[in-house]
Amino acid sequence: MTKLYDSTRPCIDTSGNYHLAQKEIHDVHDYEQNVELFRGYYAHIDEGIVNCQVRRRHEEDVQPYCGEPIFVSEYGGIKWAPDSEKGWGYGNAPKTIEEFADRYCGLTSALIENPYITGACYTQLYDVEQEQNGIYNYDRTPKFSPEIQERFRLAMQAKAAIEN
């Protein structure tokens, strides 16, 4: 429908790895929590290999990566709700705030330092009903100290390798 109104606007066919049609943007959701594994999933883009192809080889109907701009539209999802057993996030929850910050900054840096990643979006900004993986609480109050928030800001505002 978008193309009917503006044929110049790039479109994502299906968000999150499952591209079934001709696409203009290769959109990926990736909730890997191990920073080095995460970094490795994007280490061979110059050879035409993107993480979803490495981990989802059995899905033959999914369109392969063909050189389109790569947008990691969902990553992170790190659970932080130390006072609650309710809710969830991806992977094992960090045991300390410092571990959360290291993981957040590491995952973010892995994308920003990759010259083939054109964009990324941390999921998610706020906690929602069942998901306790936001940077802020459900009521929009900060979960983290100003010092930790500054670490997040610096990680997100680093110059991206694709800008060079």
Which stretches of residues belong to each language-model region?
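Surface beta-strand/loop "capping" patches
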Residues: 153-164
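Substrate-binding/catalytic cleft of secreted carbohydrate-active enzymes
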Residues: 1-142, 151
